[in-house]
């Protein structure tokens, strides 16, 4: 199961860690962190580890729990800000991912380098068959390498790369 944090939850649960990261990023004390500096750090966090959408209406985006936790753990232990590829580094390159990249190279290339989206029938997302016959694009969405980029009201869904962490990971393949 893919767990996630909402924007509000990150602001509430991780506020002290956000302030600490912002203080390292700005070379100042935690009590000198302004709202602007705090929001700037949050925006960077969101760009790297947020952007996942599993909402039929394409309204709510969430963060990768694994990556957010590892990011803040790194900030505390290393005393500097480093936006690593925590989720990807934990899982390695599963065969299913390397097969997907090999079989969808041009479409994925267009998504990575040209900012285009990957199209998939809505019915494939709403009613995925067994793991053996699932549309590989849907599986990549379910495993977090792609995310919803449009609502489910049409016959085709658009999928895209959720964030900087996954963008960098896909570029490494």
Where is each model-derived feature located?
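Phosphate-binding site recognition
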Residues: 1-173
């Amino acid at each position: 199961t893919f767990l996630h944090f909402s924007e509000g939850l990150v602001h509430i649960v991780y506020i002290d860690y956000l302030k600490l990261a912002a203080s390292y990023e700005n070379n100042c004390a935690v009590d000198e962190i302004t709202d602007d500096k705090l929001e700037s750090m949050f925006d960077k966090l969101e760009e790297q580890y947020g952007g996942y959408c599993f909402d039929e209406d394409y309204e709510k985006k969430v963060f990768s729990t694994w990556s957010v936790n590892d990011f803040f753990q790194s900030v505390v232990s290393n005393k500097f800000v480093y936006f690593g590829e925590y989720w990807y580094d934990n899982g390695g390159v599963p065969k299913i991912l390397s097969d997907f990249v090999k079989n969808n190279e041009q479409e994925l290339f267009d998504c990575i380098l040209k900012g285009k989206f990957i199209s998939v029938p809505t019915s494939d997302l709403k009613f995925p068959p067994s793991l053996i016959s699932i549309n590989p694009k849907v599986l990549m969405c379910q495993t977090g390498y792609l995310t919803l980029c449009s609502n489910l009201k049409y016959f085709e869904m658009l999928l895209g790369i959720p964030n900087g962490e996954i963008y960098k990971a896909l570029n490494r393949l």
